[in-house]
């Protein structure tokens, strides 16, 4: 919600594309990782986040729209890299909100893994669709706090380990 409010205000801010980078500048060295969770759009907050980022972990929903949106994101990232942030890289692709029913999600997952193998890292960890994630968000807490012993929480912990181990 906070990012949505910021998105409405960013165009009015002088130098809006560098505003997040400027904001994070003084605190960047205090953290190993700073996560900026953007909405699935290519609006001004997402672009400003790309300008501020060192690398991007890209969640991909294994369905047509999720796959189709990747090309637009990669094109936007290429423009940001050329003009505003030469060091921007892809940390990896994360298959997320994976449905356990039907063959289509598994087929899309295979497509994603095959299409980007050798191009970008596709994390081994897959995050399954779970009601606990939106419920945790609605309660303003992490999924770890909200649903400590649930499968989806264990998947997020596995992703964390995978990111930390592979840097």
Predicted features by range, described:
Residues 7-10, 60, 145-147:
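Short, polar/flexible loop-turn hinges at active-site or ligand-entry regions and domain interfaces
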Residues 19, 72, 155:
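Charged catalytic carboxylate motif
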Residues 158-167:
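C-terminal alpha-helix
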Residues 129-136:
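Short, glycine-rich, amphipathic interfacial segments at transmembrane boundaries or analogous
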Residues 23, 28-128:
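Conserved catalytic-core segment of NTP-binding enzymes
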Residues 1-29, 84, 136-138:
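P-loop/Walker-type NTP enzyme "switch/lid" segment
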Residues 136-155:
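C-terminal boundary of histidine-terminating zinc-finger modules
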């Amino acid at each position: 919600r906070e990012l949505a409010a910021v998105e409405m205000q960013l165009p009015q801010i002088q130098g809006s594309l560098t505003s997040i980078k400027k904001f994070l500048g003084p605190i960047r060295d205090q953290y190993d990782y700073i996560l900026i969770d953007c909405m699935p759009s290519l609006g001004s907050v997402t672009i400003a986040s790309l300008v501020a980022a060192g690398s991007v972990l890209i969640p991909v929903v294994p369905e047509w729209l999720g796959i189709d949106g990747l090309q637009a994101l990669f094109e936007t990232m290429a423009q940001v890299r050329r003009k505003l942030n030469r060091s921007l890289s892809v940390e990896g692709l994360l298959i997320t909100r994976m449905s356990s029913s039907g063959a289509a999600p598994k087929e899309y997952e295979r497509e994603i893994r095959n299409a980007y193998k050798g191009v970008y890292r596709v994390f081994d960890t897959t995050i399954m669709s779970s009601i606990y994630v939106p419920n945790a968000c609605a309660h303003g807490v992490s999924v770890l706090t909200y649903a400590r012993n649930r499968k989806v929480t264990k998947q997020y912990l596995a992703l964390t380990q995978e990111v930390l181990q592979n840097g």
